[in-house]
């Protein structure tokens, strides 16, 4: 079972439906309706942290859930979820170089982990005004955009990935589906 922490975003159920199409059972809990203790007791096979408005520190229990589950549970953060991963591990979030809502960018990646087998420089949908300003040493930058923004991070030791773009967006499909499939195989 996948625990999906919903950060009150309209894209949450796009993620749910895509994960279910890939055969996953998904349980959705809002960020103010789940604690780190409850998330741990659920013993999910995977954790997905959804997009959402605002900053990671304003997203209910999101940071606590990431910190609690990340050592043992494959974790994927999308947009705000990606930013929350960066912040949970000691990085900093700041204003993006430019606001991008419903725009596409080319994503260059390292071809490893969730990016294995994906085409290089694929087009991805972006919907964000914040981005990773400082990535902590425990995270590797796994993808960047054509304008130099961090588009992906991967923990150097734990099964944790974040993507700033939206794999569930029609602007990223079908590559986004393949990325989620790679995540589920972790």
Where are these regions (language model features)?
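A glycine-centered loop/beta-turn motif at secondary-structure junctions
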Residues: 146-186
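Generic structural signal for residues in well-ordered beta-strands
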Residues: 26-28, 93, 141
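Histidine-centered divalent metal-coordination motifs
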Residues: 79, 128, 166
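N-terminal beta1-alpha1 cap of cysteine-dependent amidohydrolase-like domains
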Residues: 1-71, 80, 175-186
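Cysteine-nucleophile active-site neighborhood
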Residues: 44-116, 123
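Catalytic beta-strand/loop cores that center a nucleophilic Ser/Cys/Thr
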Residues: 113-157
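Structural signature of beta-strand start/N-cap positions in the alpha/beta core
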Residues: 1, 24-25, 45-46, 74-76, ...
